[in-house]
Structures are given as structure tokens and as C-alpha cells.
């Protein structure tokens, strides 16, 4: 059987305004801890849109919309997904915990849970923290989080681009 790609009209896309006004809460927010690349932040927005993430927190040196480089990758997702810039990620973690979120550092730690072993609690709200391209999640932020989640990997690098990690993690916890 020959297959074909769907046409845009068949995808049932709605306008950004319609989506903003009707989107259900997913119970998941992203926290970007000092991610320096506008391309990675733009990709995070686009992936957050695809998975229905409630909000993206941009910590420290993260590029913040409006940014032409960020927009080039986000393709307008930064206009649909709510965001907030914060200077202190540790304070944000504590605020999110006080608001009832389970805050999870996506990082390789001594006690990290493998993504394939993670079981999402149906009514729980999660804040997923992703770190800088070189240093990862700051140790002080890891210390403040409730736990850590690790993407099992093979090979020699034992790391993924942060934008890839975001997509893998959001798919894994769905």
C-alpha cells in the first residue's frame, strides 16, 4: 500500500489564539537552567508546544523572546507557550515545590531514576529541569530538586544535546 503525507488541512491545526484559549493543562512545566544557545531554547519552545507543556521557565543566561535566532527555530511556538524569565533557578525550584510541583532534574546523578523506569503519577504536576549545554544542571539546583531522572544511553559520550533530551524526556513521561 502506498502511503502519503497528510496535507496541512488534514492535520486539523487551529490558530495560535484558538489554541491559547482552549489548551488543557498538562501538569508539566520546563525549567531551562542557563541554556546559552538560542537555537536550543527555540527548540525547547517548539517541543514544549508539541507536547502541550504548560509553561517554560528561562533561567539565568537563557535567551528570552523576542529573539530572531530563537524564533527561527521555535517557528512561533514562543508566542503560544507561556514563559517566564527568572534569574535564580534555585529560588524558582523552591517556588514550584511550594506550588505543588514535583521538581525533577534531568541529569545523571548517583541516585537518578532511569527514564524507562519512571512512572508518572496521574494527578501529579512535574517541573522538569534541563541544564546548560556544557555544565548540565547546576549542583545547587540538583540539590534543591526532589529527584533526578536520567536518559539511559549507550556509546561513549553519555550526553545528548539538551533540545534532544527535552524531546526524549517529554515522550518518556507522557
Label for each model-derived stretch:
Residues 1-174:
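Post-transcriptional modification and biogenesis factors for structured RNAs
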Amino acid at each position: 500500500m502506498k502511503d502519503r503525507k497528510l496535507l496541512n488541512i488534514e492535520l486539523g491545526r487551529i490558530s495560535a489564539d484558538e489554541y491559547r484559549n482552549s489548551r488543557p493543562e498538562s501538569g508539566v512545566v520546563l525549567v531551562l537552567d542557563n541554556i546559552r544557545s538560542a537555537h536550543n531554547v527555540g527548540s525547547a519552545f517548539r517541543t514544549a508546544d508539541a507536547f502541550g507543556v504548560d509553561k517554560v521557565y528561562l533561567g539565568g543566561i537563557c535567551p528570552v523572546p523576542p529573539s530572531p535566532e530563537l524564533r527561527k527555530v521555535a517557528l512561533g511556538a514562543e508566542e503560544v507557550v507561556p514563559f517566564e524569565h527568572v534569574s535564580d533557578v534555585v529560588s524558582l525550584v523552591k517556588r514550584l515545590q511550594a506550588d505543588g510541583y514535583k521538581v525533577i532534574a534531568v541529569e545523571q546523578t548517583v541516585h537518578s531514576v532511569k527514564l524507562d523506569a519512571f512512572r508518572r503519577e496521574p494527578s501529579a504536576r512535574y517541573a522538569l529541569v534541563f541544564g546548560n549545554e556544557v555544565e548540565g544542571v547546576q549542583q545547587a539546583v540538583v540539590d534543591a530538586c526532589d529527584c533526578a531522572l536520567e536518559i539511559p544511553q549507550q556509546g561513549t559520550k553519555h550526553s545528548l544535546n539538551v533540545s534532544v533530551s527535552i524531546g526524549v524526556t517529554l515522550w518518556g513521561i507522557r
